[in-house]
Amino acid sequence: MKNEDLFNYQYEAMRLLINGFDKDRMVHAYLLDGEAGTGSIDAAKYMAKKLICKKDNAPCMSCGDCKRIDSDTHLNVLYIEPIGDMIKKEQIENLIHEFSMSSLDGMPQIYIIKDADKMNVAAQNSLLKFLEEPNPNHFAFLTTSNYKKLLDTIVSRCQFIHFKPIPLSLIHISEPTRLRRIS
């Protein structure tokens, strides 16, 4: 989703995220709830760029940091997604291990967990321990389409932000392959 679409269709969600940043009141963990395609992953990446980009008009969208975040290759942004249909404890343990080492350049470290509701209970318990002792330079964005599958204690440690459904009439499909994936 393009940034302008994200701001148009998810104005309230983006306003909450950006206001926290602008007022220097970002929390350490966000739970971004919404169906697939509503922009929660794009919002998490946008906020990662906003946190890491060094330009005055952050995010600039054109510096090396912003481009690496867009291409999922930035060393300070870790992505976790289900392997098969589940996120396992080992994946969360790897995250904790990676984040136990300081950032090389003092930049914030960000992790984005796609489909967090697919974490098994062991993975959720491991993540919970990590969420309970936040590092001021670590930020989490958990995306989900069914937050009720998460432990209540995880939900309570995150700022909940709902991404509303996007009307089908507003979805522009530009690639035939994307059409096949949707249908």
Sequence positions of predicted segments:
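Clamp-loader machinery-focused feature within the broader ASCE/P-loop NTPase space
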Residues: 1-122
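ATP/adenylate-binding site constellation spanning eukaryotic-like Ser/Thr protein kinases
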Residues: 74, 92, 124, 147, ...
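Conserved AAA+ ATPase "SRH/arginine-finger" region at the nucleotide-binding site
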Residues: 81, 160-168
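A short beta-strand-to-loop transition that corresponds to the Sensor-1 phosphate-sensing loop
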Residues: 115, 142-147
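Residues immediately C-terminal
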Residues: 118-119, 133, 149, 160
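Conserved catalytic/switch belt of AAA+ P-loop NTPases
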Residues: 125-142
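Short regulatory helix/loop adjacent to the ATP-binding pocket of P-loop NTPases
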Residues: 129-130, 147-157
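Single conserved hydrophobic/aromatic residue that forms the stacking wall/gate
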Residues: 171-183
